Regions:
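Aromatic-rich peripheral "rim/lid" segments of glycoside hydrolase catalytic domains that contact
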Residues: 9, 26-43, 47-121
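Periplasmic binding protein-like
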Residues: 13, 23-26
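Histidine-centered active-site/metal-ligand motif
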Residues: 17-19
């Protein structure tokens, strides 16, 4: 569908809602491959990972952010909600007191490691 819309000049970017089901997570390689194959800017919207397993959630967030950076075509990432009192419990980067959780620090780490605080566009 993306190719048809792009060929017709109807789109020049794509937004992807990413409410990630930890049980159905595609590989990082397939995420990067998809983003690059569209050959247009990608905007990740509504990113969250609903799971009470803090380590798994942090790992998934980190992998998605790393894949987005690696793709070179992701222009923006929006997270769904602030604290875990969001639409699904334990799905965000902050706990129910709006304090950073492990996922927050893993995302921050990957951004710093990839030197993207100022360099990512």
């Amino acid at each position: 569908m993306v190719e048809v819309l792009k060929a017709e000049g109807l789109i020049d970017g794509i937004g992807i809602q990413m409410h990630v089901d930890p049980q159905l997570l595609p590989s990082v390689e397939s995420i990067v491959e998809n983003f690059r194959s569209w050959d247009i800017p990608v905007y990740i919207t509504e990113l969250d990972v609903p799971t009470s397993n803090a380590m798994l959630k942090a790992h998934i967030f980190s992998n998605i952010i790393g894949a987005a950076i690696e793709s070179g075509v992701v222009r923006q990432i929006n997270f769904w909600g602030l604290g875990s009192a969001s639409w699904q419990e334990d799905a965000t980067l902050f706990d129910s007191n709006n304090q950073p959780n492990l996922s927050y620090f893993e995302v921050l780490k990957i951004v710093i490691e990839r030197n993207c605080l100022a360099a990512c566009k």
